[in-house]
């Protein structure tokens, strides 16, 4: 299976130049939707929805989307953020996670621990049943008999939402606000506690009263995905000398649960978005 996926890494001729470099996107999720719909035009029989053809087309999309996502990102940061542009070819010897890291970095260098962490993140975020929003969206659209490109495009649109796939971006932004409020990674527990109280009172970050990265509709006691990611993060943090940053997250996690229990009478479990 891995060999089949790697054989499909190659992007169609002129696709990157015509669709990604000439028309950069402000938002990567929207650009991915655009790219998926464009791939429809490169398929000789795009509306064929029999089981075998759907499998072939699905694997083909699975193999190509990581490279397309990286190229869309490089185009975006070049045209909108005024950074240098560099485009690398996908390496057929690499896994999807390894190619992500190679394509995103100017020197294409990465460590095995970094690749393992990203691979773990990809697995933990993969479809875990038909009930989550984007997968359910896929099922609803596919039930009409439409093509897989239209179906996947709809799922990406759902995944973009801040209450679904965009939730970990909210965590990152929230933690940046907390760091600014507390004065940095070496802030004492009292300052972290005050920032959590402000978040819950709607006085910090987006003033929603939410502490992002906590709570889950199914994992009401603990989210095993968060525990797995936390352990992987520890390995990479030690290797990359980011232990101060990780320690801050761990302290925030502990204190946030304490404050939630005091204010709401119940501590919400850390979810997969917090450490991702």
Where are these regions (language model features)?
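Hydrophobic alpha-helical bundle cores within soluble ligand-binding/oligomerization subdomains
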Residues: 1-276
């Amino acid at each position: 299976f891995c060999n089949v996926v790697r054989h499909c890494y190659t992007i169609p001729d002129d696709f990157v130049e015509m669709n990604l470099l000439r028309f950069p996107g402000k938002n990567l999720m929207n650009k991915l939707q655009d790219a998926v719909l464009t791939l429809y035009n490169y398929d000789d029989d795009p509306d064929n929805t029999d089981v075998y053809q759907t499998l072939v087309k699905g694997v083909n999309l699975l193999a190509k989307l990581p490279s397309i996502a990286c190229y869309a990102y490089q185009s975006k940061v070049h045209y909108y953020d005024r950074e240098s542009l560099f485009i690398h070819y996908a390496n057929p010897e690499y896994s999807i996670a390894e190619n992500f890291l190679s394509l995103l970095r100017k020197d294409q260098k990465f460590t095995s621990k970094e690749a393992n962490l990203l691979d773990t993140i990809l697995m933990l975020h993969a479809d875990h049943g038909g009930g989550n929003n984007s997968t359910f969206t896929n099922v609803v659209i596919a039930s009409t008999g439409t093509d897989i490109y239209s179906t996947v495009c709809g799922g990406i649109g759902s995944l973009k939402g801040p209450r679904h796939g965009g939730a970990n971006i909210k965590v990152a932004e929230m933690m940046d606000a907390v760091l600014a409020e507390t004065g940095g990674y070496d802030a004492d527990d009292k300052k972290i506690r005050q920032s959590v109280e402000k978040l819950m009172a709607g006085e910090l970050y987006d003033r929603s009263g939410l502490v992002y990265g906590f709570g889950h509709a199914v994992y009401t006691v603990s989210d095993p995905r968060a525990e797995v990611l936390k352990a992987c993060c520890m390995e990479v943090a030690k290797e990359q000398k980011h232990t101060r940053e990780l320690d801050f997250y761990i302290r925030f996690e502990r204190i946030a649960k304490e404050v939630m229990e005091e204010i709401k009478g119940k501590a919400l479990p850390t979810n997969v978005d917090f450490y991702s």
